[in-house]
């Protein structure tokens, strides 16, 4: 029987074809004993596969699934992905045994996150470049030392690093407004960078600040009120002998109720 650009015995129980067309769907009916069809080497579209499955629901069909610019065996347990689109996600339903996908060479991060959301049981790997380093999807601690990095670059990278817990950027040159915006966007991440206060730099995870004996002006107090929000772990501020009146402290105490002002 002519099929797939060749001829095959009509008594065959299995067929392996390098070419398959819509016209071959009807020809399969001549193979009365056929139980398995391997067309992984053929350029078969999902629509053509559906035609085969609809006509022969009991037939075991092994084919190659087109995703992005690559094709993958339908019975693959693990695959190495090239870039793909969100619109390709329904094609992953055709895999019969897929358990792992390696997307470390992909840059289609929105599609990767969509794939992760659609198939949470899939072991999915990817990596995200940040500054001069790369981080796997399960990275918890991010260390940044490239001062030319922009807030938007870090923001973009963090969106694709769902396991990130801490970001360390000791020489961060950004404004306090830019830092505050990032903390607000990623409240579950602890940012560790330097905070400039009264001409001195302090780590943002400082727990206690002391300005005891240093004269504090109204302008200084205003700066203090603005900067304290940058300290993520602050517990105590020592203002003994600074000349600050109690009534001037009330707005600060109200703004930071968890901080002990002494």
Indicate where each model-derived feature is located:
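N-terminal capping/linker segments that flank leucine-rich repeat
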Residues: 1-262
């Amino acid at each position: 029987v002519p099929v797939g650009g060749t001829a095959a015995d009509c008594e065959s129980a299995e067929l392996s074809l390098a070419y398959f067309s819509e016209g071959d769907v009807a020809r399969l009916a001549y193979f009365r004993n056929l139980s398995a069809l391997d067309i992984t080497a053929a350029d078969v579209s999902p629509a053509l596969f559906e035609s085969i499955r609809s006509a022969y629901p009991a037939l075991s069909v092994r084919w190659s699934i087109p995703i992005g610019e690559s094709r993958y065996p339908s019975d693959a347990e693990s695959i190495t992905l090239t870039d793909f689109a969100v619109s390709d996600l329904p094609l992953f339903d055709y895999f019969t045994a897929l358990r792992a996908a390696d997307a470390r060479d992909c840059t289609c991060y929105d599609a990767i996150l969509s794939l992760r959301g659609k198939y949470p049981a899939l072991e999915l790997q990817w990596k995200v470049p940040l500054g001069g380093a790369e981080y796997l999807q399960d990275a918890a601690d991010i260390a940044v030392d490239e001062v030319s990095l922009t807030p938007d670059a870090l923001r973009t990278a963090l969106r694709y690093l769902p396991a990130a817990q801490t970001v360390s950027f000791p020489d961060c040159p950004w404004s306090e407004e830019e830092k505050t915006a990032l903390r607000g966007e990623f409240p579950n991440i602890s940012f560790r960078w330097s905070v400039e206060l009264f001409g001195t730099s302090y780590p943002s995870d400082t727990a206690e600040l002391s300005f005891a004996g240093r004269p504090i002006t109204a302008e200084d107090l205003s700066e203090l009120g603005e900067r304290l929000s940058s300290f993520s772990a602050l517990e105590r501020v020592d203002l003994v002998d600074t000349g600050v009146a109690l009534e001037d402290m009330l707005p600060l105490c109200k703004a930071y109720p968890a901080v002990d002002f002494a």
